[in-house]
Amino acid sequence: MAELKYISGFGNECSSEDPRCPGSLPEGQNNPQVCPYNLYAEQLSGSAFTCPRSTNKRSWLYRILPSVSHKPFESIDEGQVTHNWDEVDPDPNQLRWKPFEIPKASQKKVDFVSGLHTLCGAGDIKSNNGLAIHIFLCNTSMENRCFYNSDGDFLIVPQKGNLLIYTEFGKMLVQPNEICVIQRGMRFSIDVFEETRGYILEVYGVHFELPDLGPIGANGLANPRDFLIPIAWYEDRQVPGGYTVINKYQGKLFAAKQDVSPFNVVAWHGNYTPYKYNLKNFMVINSVAFDHADPSIFTVLTAKSVRPGVAIADFVIFPPRWGVADKTFRPPYYHRNCMSEFMGLIRGHYEAKQGGFLPGGGSLHSTMTPHGPDADCFEKASKVKLAPERIADGTMAFMFESSLSLAVTKWGLKASRCLDENYHKCWEPLKSHFTPNSRNPAEPN
């Protein structure tokens, strides 16, 4: 496959034409009486018309046939997608999942949509407030099928296997250690090349943004130039009665048939697009004096709530970096948090837990549920002689953090068959080191 080209920049006002049809963008207006090449003009709105310019999201698509050219939608029963946060009783315990099992292609072919499983979530889709965390487990490409989400934005984190994603805006190749965001309403189809697994953070009613940098300054963390947007590409392909458009609407899946490929956009312009980002480009900020900094310094993207400084969801990574803090317990500290913390692992291991937390698995530490380094990590980090050291080389852990109290689904607790019933035992060996007659502990040699 030829190397794909992209446009650079987060949230930019962009325009793109398929080079096979030069001049396909109208000049000086959005919807002329007759578009170049006799295309249809269609606007895709990601915000209310009256939002301030700084938050107004929309794109104009110039396509061979408009999206409305389909037969009626009908409800389908496919995958394990849900928005029912009350199907099992709440569980405040620390939860950890072993790597989620990918179905074997020799037993059953499963594509991205049929391999979607909702793990946990909170909020209300109908009021555009909340989120869901999904796991996708698939072994075959989507053939003459596409998907779009009426409920929210998908932040997709592939863990195993490359994703070739066809969108109405063009094509993206997304590999492990990259992420992509497919925003609300955008149609896409995914080709896979092997048994494939990954994580999805879905947010309702808001879009992902770059976090404010404050005293960090003008540069740092995820820089806007490193986000890549696909360039226009179209196919004029007839599929008589055989192309299926799948829609997630109010948490349910629906399907409609049409006679053509939906990827028939010859040109587009706007600021409402899909995009991808390579996590290796994250510019890490860290403590260079003492103490363990809060993990918010590792925020890649945030979906803000109406409360200043409080997110519906943050996407946070724990990338390779230097650890140099003096007189400091360097691993993550013990913590009880008003936020919910879901963690996943793309590759390698996580610094606070060397065993049990594996690539393709996950953990959930719910609101105010205590968590922190396991006993082995505490003993080693408390006694090691401190020197500058590399941390997390060859690894990439991440966190979906939310101000919402997340409910785990029946699939997450039971049907996945991946819940680690012994997770709590990693803290059982912790013991008291209290020395009431000696304030100053001995320094490590």
Curated annotation (Swiss-Prot):
Keyword terms of this UniProt record: Acetylation, Dioxygenase, Disease variant, Iron, Metal-binding, Oxidoreductase, Phenylalanine catabolism, Tyrosine catabolism
Family matches, as InterPro entries: HgmA_C, HgmA_N, Homogentis_dOase, RmlC-like_jellyroll, RmlC_Cupin_sf
Any one Gene Ontology molecular-function term assigned to this protein's record: identical protein binding
EC class of the enzyme, as a word: oxidoreductase
Enzyme Commission no: 1.13.11.5
Pathway: Amino-acid degradation; L-phenylalanine degradation; acetoacetate and fumarate from L-phenylalanine: step 4/6
Reaction(s) the record says it catalyses: homogentisate + O2 = 4-maleylacetoacetate + H(+)
Reported effect, M368V: In AKU; loss of activity
GO biological process, one term: L-phenylalanine catabolic process
Top-level taxon of the source organism: Eukaryota
Cofactor: Fe cation
Sequence positions bearing N6-succinyllysine: K414
Modified residues (N6-acetyllysine): K98
GO cellular-component term (any): cytosol
Function: Catalyzes the conversion of homogentisate to maleylacetoacetate.
Disease listed for this protein: Alkaptonuria: An autosomal recessive error of metabolism characterized by an increase in the level of homogentisic acid. The clinical manifestations are urine that turns dark on standing and alkalinization, black ochronotic pigmentation of cartilage and collagenous tissues, and spine arthritis.
Database matches in PANTHER family: HOMOGENTISATE 1,2-DIOXYGENASE (PTHR11056:SF0)
Subunit structure as annotated in this protein's UniProt entry: Homohexamer arranged as a dimer of trimers.
Protein name stated in the entry: Homogentisate 1,2-dioxygenase
Gene, per the UniProt record: HGD
